[in-house]
Regions:
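Short linear motifs embedded in intrinsically disordered, proline/glycine-rich low-complexity segments
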Residues: 1-137
């Protein structure tokens, strides 16, 4: 699979309010007898990004009459592009890797961010699964 299987966005109240975006699909999502006891599950990681709400981000209709304000959909695009890179190049990311983007990582904004650094998620860290280790980067 070249694309991610999905992405979840969580509201976090820890210290300053932020959105926590976590991918799924870079690791084995389902029990696979052929993957049991492998060192790493799938590529061995999932993307995890924490961002503060940005006033210019669009709102999202939750379908139940409620609206989630300022959804960071741009992060999903970044994660999808990184997933495509991994699947196409067969090169994966590990803790403390850096990848230049050669342009701002977020279009149509005045950001100075032109690369992605991979660090362990401070809350999720990593887990051992029946299919191998998964780090949240």
């Amino acid at each position: 699979m070249i694309n991610l299987a999905g992405v979840s966005i969580f509201d976090c109240e820890d210290s300053a309010f932020h959105r926590h975006i976590v991918s799924f699909g870079m690791s084995e999502l389902y029990y696979d007898p052929q993957s049991v006891q492998e060192e790493f599950s799938g590529w061995g990681f999932e993307f995890s990004m924490r961002v503060a709400p940005f006033a210019d981000d669009p709102d999202s209709d939750l379908g139940d009459g409620n609206v989630a304000p300022n959804e960071p959909f741009w992060v999903i695009s970044v994660m999808q592009n990184l997933a495509k890179y991994v699947h196409t190049s067969k090169k994966w990311f590990e803790v403390y890797h850096f990848m230049p983007a050669n342009s701002p990582i977020r279009l149509n904004t005045d950001t100075k961010l032109v690369g992605v650094a991979f660090a362990p998620d401070p809350v999720l860290g990593g887990i051992d699964t029946p299919n191998g280790r998964v780090e949240f980067l």
